[in-house]
Amino acid sequence: MRFLRSLWAWFVIVVATLAFGIPSIFAAFVPPRGEWYLPFARGWARVVLAGTGVRVRASGSDRAAAADGCVYFANHESLFDIFVLLAVLPGRLRFLAKKSLFSVPVLGWSMAAAGYVPVDRDDRRQAAESLEIAAARLRGGMRVIIFPEQTRTRTGELLPFKKGGVLLALKTGAPIVPVAIAGTFAIQQRGGFWLSPGRVEVEIGEPIPVGGMTVADRHALTARAREAIEALRASARGRLPSAEGSSPAPSAARD
């Protein structure tokens, strides 16, 4: 039963990606460029969540309602984080995403057409160029989503944060909006085939202003953002059924 359920879930993801991804490539070029892409992306995310039996509840959306040109910082537990964030976060969204995703047929093509920002973590020069592109998106009133851990956790616990997102916020003066996701680790784990239906809680925190700060404040600002997400995540986990809110042992995460 678990195998068939997982197989069905992957089938839903593939079909939805094709059904929404192909027309979204063309929609991304309709003036104003990239603006017609987001409804397709949100539709794709919501169809995948509904088709795989994932229920999402978000709180705190009003805290980010007026934060145009903000940087969303979110923890990264699962592939499903992308669907969840597209479904619930307000604003004109763009992801900072790892470069390899842009090579995925249909998905990568649509991301490139829509103006998502590729990041090559192994190339510092390219990473700096990506921050410049993301800064331009922010100045245009878009909201950039960043996973500051830069990878999905293998244990369900929060990983150390990298500084790139903080540098972007400092460069543009855009506030950081912390976002905590709880429950996706129980639905799908990094590198795993198994997919389970379940409930996800998302909690959006108060924007963290960066006005008056400089690059010298990057370590303190990174720590503050991480602490905010840690606290929000604990609150979100507390609203989940115990089996979904708890993190499995590291050995279970590798299965």
Annotated model-derived regions:
Residues 75-76, 112-114, 194-197:
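Short, hinge-like loop/turn segments at secondary-structure boundaries
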Residues 5-12, 41-97:
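Conserved H-X4-D acyltransferase segment
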Residues 79-129, 133:
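Membrane-embedded segments
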Residues 1-57, 109-114:
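A transmembrane-helix-recognition feature enriched in membrane-embedded lipid enzymes
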Residues 48-51, 72-73, 121-125, 154-156:
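Short, flexible loop segments at the rims of nucleotide/cofactor-binding pockets, characterized by
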Residues 128-255:
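Non-catalytic C-terminal accessory region of glycerolipid acyltransferases
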